[in-house]
Amino acid sequence: MIRISQLKLPITHTKAQLEKKIAKTLKNPGNSFTYEIRKQSLDCRHKNDKIFVYTVDVTIRDEQKLAKKVNNNNIMLTKEKPYEFPSPGETPLLHSPVIVGSGPAGLFCGWYLAKAGYCPIILERGEEAEKRQKTVENFWKNGVLDPESNVQFGEGGAGTFSDGKLNTLVKDPYGRNHEVLKRFVAAGAPEEIIYQQKPHLGTDVLVGIVEKMRHEIEEMGGKFCFRSKVTDLIFENNTLKEIEINNDKRIPAQVCVLAPGHSARDTFEMLQKRGVYMEPKSFAVGLRIEHPQEMINMDLYGEPENELLGAASYKVTHKCANGRGVYSFCMCPGGYVVNASSEPGRLAVNGMSYQARDSRNANSAMIVTVTPEDFPDKGVLGGVEFQRDLEKKAWELGEGKIPVQLFGDFCKNQASEALGEVTPCMKGEYILTNVRSVLPKAVGDSIEEGVRAFGKRVSGFDREDALLSGIESRTSSPVRIVRDQELTANMAGIYPCGEGAGYAGGITSAAMDGIKVAETVCRKYAAIKNN
């Protein structure tokens, strides 16, 4: 196989033009070939000459001879190494492995274990995706919160109500990233996510994908139990024996994959009581910021709209004078700010986009790093307490509604009384107030400095009527459930997994970690179906 990089074409190019470019690069006017796009990125440095840059893998006769003949630094011989799931181990499994949580980590762990014959049981505290969607929409419309099935909990995890970004910075020598993307495509995602620089799915597409993955897992011998919150783990001699569900039913368990999500605070409390080792970790908190999507498009594309490219995105970071980092997070082009609360009397927000990314606003979190030093002497769950305190203040400030403030008023530390040209795109009720009043001083100062700095990079970013809303507190897990080289906790049979356990950040990396844990379980234990 020959890999060609730096193939540059206008954004209006056709498939035939790409194929012609490949043939010309290989100096191959006649021989037939097949190709697969490995990467597509956008170069907008010249607004009037926007281009796509491709990396493609080409299969053609006499590849070695051809590669030497062409003598081009952008051409190299390569050999694709397909992903391989390990063969089963020999230790007998007396009971089906139990997976706690059906977010990306739990779903992918479950899918691969089911395919290998392990008949996993997946316990999910929330509802099936279709029921959960109705519950969440009712919450946004009527303010009735279900603490067990909401934006954070339920089939698909917190990522179901997000932009559905699939890019990751995790190094992947084993091919798990590509495997995750292929699995999404097989479940209904568009094929372009395989090679796009910034692939995304959107909430509307994600719901259908997780439903299909559930059905596939069930067809392969897996079982789902919804409205089934794990309330206790029973150990004997530091070894898992049983799992308690809903403070009532107990099931025997030998293997438990813990993939509870980053908001499973009651689960973290239970683990602490049971002696499972955890450690506090750094995370970030802040606010959402909204701008007109056309403004962001103008800055990147040089035009307010481009049908070929869709809504533009940005990624910005800044090191503040106080030493803290402030940066954009979970940027949602053409998206919505959503009420993402999961606990009564507390309020959190998140960003969400549908696949079309066609709302009038762009939004992103403006978040500031916090470390365990910001909540000293609070113990392992100090970060949880820190989050809860901010969310309680936000709920009280907005009387249960999303608190919103214009950036100009934020800088003056005064309540907003009227909107400017930017009007909110939100799911859930909002109220104008002084959002800054709920933030720690260091966080508020950092956001103000950061937005000012970003205004020098993205024209209009620091406009007075940009909208800030909060609080964005669920960026990542505030704890890490400690695991060893065998991916097990200090209690035998427990496999911490995914974002909630502190080993991922986003849909793709969580799914990859789910596969990684499934591999580990498989290497040790014999499959159920073969017993």
Roles of regions detected by a PLM:
Residues 1-52, 56-531:
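Residues forming the flavin
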